[in-house]
Amino acid sequence: GLQLPYAEVLWREGDDGGEPLLPRPLVQALQLNGGAAHGADPRDHRTITPQPTLPPQAHGSELPVQRLSASAYEDLRRCPYRFFALRQLGLKEADELEDEVDKRDFGLWLHAVLKIFHEALAADVTLGDGLAARLALMEQAAAEATRAAGLPDAAFLPFAAAWPQVRDGYLQWLAEHEATGARFGWAERWQELPLGSITLVGQIDRLDQLADGSTLVMDYKTESIGTTQGRVKTPTEDTQLAFYAALQPDDTLQAAYVNVGEKGGTKTVLQPDVVDVRDVLITGIRHDMERITSGAAMAAAVRLAETPEM
């Protein structure tokens, strides 16, 4: 191309990440030798009047909320428009068939294992607190949960490799937990509570009775311990435990996340002052439902609007 009497050479001055890009050495050499000159930009410059598009101002007063779960209320707190779209309009993404087992599948499986284990342990008083018997019972529960879930052996291998550490860490935590006088109450039970014109609903992972007679509401987590601790760093910003506490007619209860880790063992992360946080949450729910009924705009939160999900 350089043999022609005239040639136009174009190059990018920056990449997609904003980093500057220099022309190729050949082009730089031509510029230094006077063999190339910057051409004039042939594009016409135009002044365009901005015409911003306002975010949607949805109103949910014609779609009354009758049942409210912890995850639904979390949607409302994070992004009212998301709540309107998913919970009131019922818009959902089409489900995709996946043959890979992910962390969520492992979490569901673990919930099932612990439910089977604790119910069997509570039903057989002869087992006591012997570690060998509990290990055998936990393995039976794992096998039963795997069969019920229909999980393929090959796909489950990564989690199967981590299971012994998870199991042993949990049993050690359980022994320490029971040493305080705590006793298993029930697991995976659906709860409902009328609140004005709506009904609060949810399935609580586990409820124990403590030595002083009070109740401990628990929710299992398989995430990193730092993530779990971050949930309770600002108590009033955590929806889940306070919501589950609202489903229990008890003013002396406690609530905690039980982080079932693969490497660091199982740890309890208490939600401090959960009764006070629960009362604040209930007040907030009443207020928010009244605003929706009165026609308040369901605005989109910018931080979520940047990642469309509808």
Where do the language-model regions lie?
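RecB-family 4Fe-4S metal-dependent nuclease core
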Residues: 8-10, 14-310
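Conserved short internal alpha-helix adjacent to the catalytic or cofactor-binding core
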Residues: 1-3, 58-59
